[in-house]
Design a protein with these regions (language model features):
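FAD-binding beta-loop-beta segment adjacent to the flavin cofactor pocket
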Residues: 16, 132-135, 190-212, 262, ...
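A short, flexible beta-alpha/helix-coil linker loop
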Residues: 32-34, 155-157, 217-220
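N-terminal FAD cofactor-binding segment of flavoenzymes
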Residues: 1-32, 47, 107, 111
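C-terminal helical "tail/cap" subdomain of flavin- and related membrane-associated enzymes
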Residues: 239-341
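Short, solvent-exposed loop/turn segments at secondary-structure boundaries
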Residues: 38-41, 99, 160-164, 223-226
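N-terminal Rossmann-like dinucleotide/flavin-binding domain of flavoprotein oxidoreductases
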Residues: 22, 29, 40-60
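Predominantly flavin-linked oxidoreductase catalytic cores and closely associated redox partners
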Residues: 55-185, 193-202, 211
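Conserved mid-domain beta->alpha element of the FAD-binding
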Residues: 197-269
Length: 341
């Protein structure tokens, strides 16, 4: 997570749980490499689990599948039921025909290497790798002198994840870089939505009266698919709710989600350009052009705070994709329905 993604108090709230914070990061493309001075933090699932377990103590229920979640309680697969005035559904993305999506798919291996890797900063986007049938890059996170997370990320039209194929690719890249893997410490994988358009009101209506957060509630960055920064905002919204009841919190979250959707329209245009305006092997050129822009603009992009001037700066100049194809991508989808609740 980049430091400017969250407000100052939001960053301060989660900073104790970061495994590491770096003073900057790098990117690599066929035409150049660049180092940026934006602070970057690594928050692991283990750290989040530890914080949650410490806060909930004996009230934490683990290893149980939730079959039903309603505004007044939840029912588990083992037959247990819980009643509560406030139920929050954070079970991740759910399939919905209301939204049209591309997908950010990734598999990462945290490895202990036989020798130090030599990286001092994260490389959040290494697009010098083979592109093939989609926009693809590697994400490299140096967690220690000989500990390295190597993640293969692909922006794909289909959500299916070829776990074995991704893993083989990661090991091949490690070999090319001269990194001999002594041990795989853990694996992570995911498929995140990259929204191209749709009827957000219909998406919200599918949730019923249960407050939904994270990807399930539509709270994620429209281009990266990441949800941590918006999770901080929604947590603050819930914590300050005048009445902690499911229906009241659901209304407040819907209002926030609709406001976010309306503010994210420009990102959905860019997403359509990425997925529809260039041949798959050429899509990296869009990001290659983007990362030449000033660092403050890049920070505002990931923080969801683009100004009108920023949007103009992103679009002006010689486009990295054919002009007619870009126009078709912008205009080629059906008119987006207005969000409603």
């Amino acid at each position: 997570m980049f430091r400017p993604d969250a407000a100052k108090d939001g960053w301060s709230a989660i900073e104790p749980y970061f495994e590491r914070i770096w003073s900057g990061y790098t990117v690599a493309f066929p035409e150049y490499r660049r180092r940026l001075g934006t602070e970057y933090g690594c928050l692991t699932g283990a750290a989040l689990y530890g914080a949650t377990a410490a806060a909930l103590g004996a009230n934490l229920v683990e290893g149980a599948e939730v079959l039903e979640a309603g505004p007044d309680g939840a029912r588990l697969a083992d037959g247990r039921s819980f009643l509560a005035p406030l139920v929050i559904d954070g079970r991740g993305w759910r399939h919905s025909t209301a939204l049209r999506c591309g997908w950010q798919k990734f598999v990462g291996l945290e490895c202990r290497l036989e020798q130090p890797h030599g990286l001092d900063l994260p490389m959040v986007m290494d697009a010098e790798v083979e592109q093939a049938d989609c926009f693809r890059f590697l994400y490299l996170l140096p967690l220690g002198p000989d500990r390295l997370l190597i993640e293969d990320t692909r922006y794909s039209a289909e959500p299916e994840l070829d776990l074995r194929g991704f893993t083989v690719s990661i090991r091949r890249h490690a070999g090319v870089r001269g990194w001999r893997i002594a041990e795989v410490l853990r694996r992570e994988e995911g498929v995140l939505p990259v929204v191209l358009g749709g009827d957000f009101g219909a998406f919200l209506a599918e949730q019923g009266s249960v407050p939904a957060v994270g990807a399930r509630g539509g709270f994620f960055h429209p281009t990266s698919g990441y949800s941590l920064a918006r999770a901080i905002d929604t947590a603050a919204l819930i914590a300050t709710a005048p009445r902690p009841a499911s229906r009241d919190v659901a209304t407040a979250l819907r209002q926030r989600a609709i406001a976010d959707w309306r503010g994210d329209g420009f990102y959905r245009v860019l997403n359509r350009m990425l997925f529809q305006a260039a041949a798959p092997a050429e899509r990296y050129r869009i990001l290659q052009r983007f990362y030449r822009l000033p660092q403050p603009l890049i920070e505002r992009f990931y923080g969801g705070r683009l100004t009108l001037a920023d949007k103009a700066r992103i679009l002006l100049g010689r486009p990295p994709v054919p002009i007619l194809a870009a126009l078709r991508a912008v205009r080629g989808l059906p008119q987006e329905a207005s969000a409603h609740a």
